Amino acid sequence: MTKKTKRTLALGLAAAAGVTLLAGLDARLVVRTYAIESEQVSTPVRLAVLTDLHACAYGEGQKNLLDAVAVQCPDLVLLCGDIVDDDPRMPEERALTTVEALAEVWPVYYVTGNHEFWTGRVEEIRELLRARGAVVLEGESA
């Protein structure tokens, strides 16, 4: 392989790695809809299940996220962990504002994720979420 080919290949790999890294840091909102039937549930229940938000921004004041939830007309919202992030560059207040806005409209239930544990402040985060209106589940069900 020539020196020029090696350099071109190295630049190409570096560019691909950069694009991959940027894609991983870009918070994209993904909405998926599932219909699950159960004989144990007598009336339909609409759930909005949010997970791995990592305190990312979803529009001004989290408008994109809140609008995406509202369109689904949920009966309640489930927060399945990693709502905040252990990275200090991700503003925790953004996650708390999201929870507060959700709780103003729907019942909100939260379970702790690994990133909350990694902060070393699990109990504090749970209390902050409770104060914003979330029901914090710990080894129990709603």
Predicted feature descriptions by range:
Residues 1-41:
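N-terminal membrane-anchoring alpha-helices
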Residues 43-137:
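Membrane-embedded segments
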Residues 138-142:
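A substrate-binding/cap region within the structured catalytic cores of diverse enzymes
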